Amino acid sequence: MTTASRDARLRIYFVGVGGQGTLTATNLLARAALDCGIEAVGGEVHGMAQRGGVVESALLLGGWRSPRVDRGEADILLGFEPLETLRGLPYLRQGGAVFSSSDPLAPLSVALGQAVYPGIERIRAQVAEVAAKAWFLPCRSLGREAGSVQSAGTVLLGAACASGLLPLTFDDLAAAIRKHLPAKIQAVNLAAAELGRAAVA
């Protein structure tokens, strides 16, 4: 599969729920880019990192001055939970790409019966109205298969890096996992990334 040019300028928007490793994934992808000589600017947009809160972050590759991503500007949206993918959709430009978990993690309002969780098919349909390409992966299930549900975010990164849409290859991501993650969780995350790659093959 071809890979975007190392000189590509991309705006990536991440959205998830606290406890899912959204910020860890953002930082890992940023480090992978920097290791390859790609300029990377990132930042937390909105953080309620305690378990269950909404977490949003941005990563801009290729020489941007500010980590800010406004509505309709993101080239790629990484959603770590389907409903959060839907909430982050306004930030995606028309014709952009989405990588999303298809495994719901119902928010407290749904758990308490105060709100209804939309079906995954409805979420897919709304994403299809904006995104030219979209992948929905059972990230929590694949993370569990890799050895830890906490590696679900790495499943998404593996899929994104294997898609050819980023200026990073899958091998670049694997190298960053080996270099930047603690030794005790490297094998699990490498396995998770591989499952993500296989899901978009």
Question: Residues of each region from the PLM?
Answer:
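Active-site cofactor/cluster-binding pocket
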Residues: 2-201
